[in-house]
Structures are given as C-alpha cells and as structure tokens.
Amino acid sequence: MKIKEARMKTKEESLLATLAVLGIAALVAYLFPDHSLPAAGPRASSDSAMPLGKTLEPGRGRHAISPTGIPGKGWRDILWRTYDQINEDRLLAVAAGVVFYGLLALFPAITALVSSYALFADTKTVNDHISFLSEFLPSGTFSIVQDQVARVLSNGDMKLGTTFIASLLLAIWSANGGMKAIIDALNVVNDEKEKRGFFTLNAVSLAFTVGGVLATLTAIGFVVVVPILLSLVGLSSSTDLLIRIGRWPALAIMLLLGLAILYQLAPSRRPPKWRWISIGSAVATVTWMIGSGLLSFYLANFGHYDVTYGSLGAAIALMIWMWMSTIVVLFGAELNAEIEHQTAEDSTVGAAKPIGSRGATMADTIGASY
C-alpha cells in the first residue's frame, strides 16, 4: 500500500513539474513569437488595402450562400488564408496555452465524470467502462487517468448528498477553466474580443463543461454498455457484428456534432449558420481520429519517452496528445472562419443583415484573393 501511495505521489510531482515546464514554454512562445511572421495577416488587409471591386471579383464565390457554392478559385483563396492565419494567430503557441489549462482541469474533470458515473454503477463496473478511454489515449498515458479514477473511487460508495454535490460542483468549476481557455482560443481564431460579461461567459463555459461530461458518459454507455445489452438479447452473429462495428462511426458523428456546437456557440460573436461550420467540423473529426491513431502507433512502437524523461514519460505523451487534439480543433475552427470569410452574403443566423452590422468579424469582412 505504501509503495502504491509513493508511486502515485511521484506521478503527481512529475505532472506538476510538467505543468510548470509547459506553462513557461507557452509564456515564452507568447512573449517572443517568431519575428518572421507578417505584421498583418490577410484578414487585416482584405478590406482596407484591397479595392472592393477586386475583392468581389467573379468566380470566387463572393455571393455564395453555402460552401457548396464556392468554386475552385475560392477554395484556393480559403486554403491559402487558412495557412497564413495559422501563422498569424500563432496557433501552435495558443494550443500549448490551452493544453496548460487543460492539464490543470484534467483531474477535476475526471473527478466529476467518475463521481457522476459512480452514482449509477459499482466500482468494478466504473473501472471496466472507463477503460474504453484507453482506445483513444496514446500508449502508456491511460495510467494517469487510471490513477485518478482509483483515487476517486477509493473514497467509498458515492451517495447523493450535500457533501457529494458540493464536491461535484467544485470539480466542475475547476474543470471550467480548461473550457474557458478553449473559448479564448476560438475567439483568437475568429478575430473576436470577448464581449460577454463575467456571468454570461461562465454560464456558457459551464454549459459546455457539463455537456462534455454528459457526452463522455453517453459515449461510454454507447460504446461499452450497448454491446453488453445486445448480447443479452441474442441477435444473430451478423447483426451483432454490424452493430459492434457501427458504434464507432456513430461515435464519430457524436464528435462531429459536438465540435459543430462548440464552433457555433463558444466564440463571442453572432453565431454562424450550420452550413458554414459543417466542413471544418468534419475535417477536424477525421483528422483527429487519424492523428490519434498514428500518434498512438508511434508512441507504442518508437516514442519511448520513459527512457528520455523517466517518470515524466507518460505525462509528456499525454501532453503531446492533448496538444495535437487542440491543434486539430483550432484548425477546424480556422478553416470554418476562412470559408465564412469568402462570401459577402450574410452567413450568420437570423434575418439577413448588411455587411458591417452582422456582429461577427468573419461575416462583416471579406477575405483576400490569391
């Protein structure tokens, strides 16, 4: 027992050290950006430096009412601007900052997740079902999650009471910091300043935090519990196989919808219509699934971080996975922003408004041509 406690204490100290290193790196990247970057990106110059006639030249989808109405030249503009804005917005450094706050929010989020799940399931069931997360995390990093799950469950049976509710609310509030970091990053991508007040901003971020916990519980139930229930029904082998395979595309659709909701409602701006955020959401979903698989394969076969970093190896691998995931999410948002930036038509929800009065930088300006 003492050995296990010592091992868990060592991992906690290692993770704290990793957080400190990442925080310093993010601060340095923010204070000392690459001086080779342009002083002003295409967004800043598209309306002030380019004549309106040039900006609205035909054949580029300037009057498209959906992404499908944008021709090839327009998509070339979109891809070039997306590439430029990844540098202009210092996407990699911003993602590193999000990871720092995400790591601080990780343990409270796990606590909220496990505490909620433990209300309806025993300790063994919770451990078995939570283990499905190991299929998405890089090799060796799931042990960090496992240790925190064991720590929460070691407190005994969860019962709905004042103490439990207070602890759960505290955990959700702590995890809320990570969500606010994502919202801040999405504001950067959309060239927006936070205009919502303290209470409105926290209400939005808390809604996304609670929604994330509920979505994870739903995913666990869908991926783990549904096959168990189906096995009790006694379906034919072919039907059972089809359902077991089909749960993964269904999970991808859930992720796509979650990203679309995040892209639409998280930034401080008038929300875009669904059609303008669908492509970025789909690209981010597919890229994340492929990227997670490739990263897991690399870490399992080539990336032996425990040799280089010792006890920090698992934490470093987890950080890299979180960084990759954040970059993918922000890339999807960047792509959506530039798709919306291509048209002069109103891309926001509600009644159409003239350009300049739509309450969103990407809808109120027109992107540069290449």
Q: Where is each model-derived feature located?
A:
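Membrane-embedded alpha-helices and immediately adjacent juxtamembrane helical segments
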Residues: 2-370
